[in-house]
Amino acid sequence: MAIRTKLGDLLRPLNSEYGKVAPGWGTTPLMAVFMVLFGIFLLIILQIYNKSLLLEDINVSWESLSF
């Protein structure tokens, strides 16, 4: 038998949509756009780390992090 708590009563509306699927594609295109932007961000970080994207006056060595 489940015990009713105040926290459970507060969280119940968040679970009311369980099992329901929005018709069509929903927010999939928006998610795809953010995934592409995140991928581009990761590529830029990787290129900076590998020094294949050169930025003037920015040192990416570990020694530059020391005080």
Curated annotation (Swiss-Prot):
Q: Could you tell me which Gene3D superfamilies the record lists for this protein?
A: Photosystem II reaction center protein H
Q: Name one GO molecular function term.
A: phosphate ion binding
Pfam families in UniProt: PsbH
SUPFAM superfamilies (alphabetical):
Photosystem II 10 kDa phosphoprotein PsbH
Q: Tell me what topology the record assigns in the membrane.
A: Single-pass membrane protein
Give the record's GO CC terms: photosystem II; plasma membrane-derived thylakoid membrane
Q: What's in the keyword line of the UniProt record?
A: Membrane, Photosynthesis, Photosystem II, Thylakoid, Transmembrane, Transmembrane helix
Q: Where in the cell is it found?
A: Cellular thylakoid membrane
* Superkingdom: Bacteria
Q: Which InterPro entries match?
A: PSII_PsbH, PSII_PsbH_sf
The processes (GO biological process) annotated in the record are: photosynthesis; protein stabilization
Q: Which positions, given as ranges, span the membrane? A: 29-49
Q: What function does this protein fulfil?
A: One of the components of the core complex of photosystem II (PSII), required for its stability and/or assembly. PSII is a light-driven water:plastoquinone oxidoreductase that uses light energy to abstract electrons from H(2)O, generating O(2) and a proton gradient subsequently used for ATP formation. It consists of a core antenna complex that captures photons, and an electron transfer chain that converts photonic excitation into a charge separation.
Record's subunit section: PSII is composed of 1 copy each of membrane proteins PsbA, PsbB, PsbC, PsbD, PsbE, PsbF, PsbH, PsbI, PsbJ, PsbK, PsbL, PsbM, PsbT, PsbX, PsbY, PsbZ, Psb30/Ycf12, peripheral proteins PsbO, CyanoQ (PsbQ), PsbU, PsbV and a large number of cofactors. It forms dimeric complexes.
The UniProt family comment states: Belongs to the PsbH family.
Q: Which PANTHER family match?
A: PHOTOSYSTEM II REACTION CENTER PROTEIN H
- Put simply, this protein is called Photosystem II reaction center protein H
From what organism does this protein derive?
Synechococcus sp. (strain JA-3-3Ab) (Cyanobacteria bacterium Yellowstone A-Prime)
Q: According to the entry, what is the taxonomic lineage of the organism?
A: Bacteria, Bacillati, Cyanobacteriota, Cyanophyceae, Synechococcales
Gene, per the UniProt record: psbH
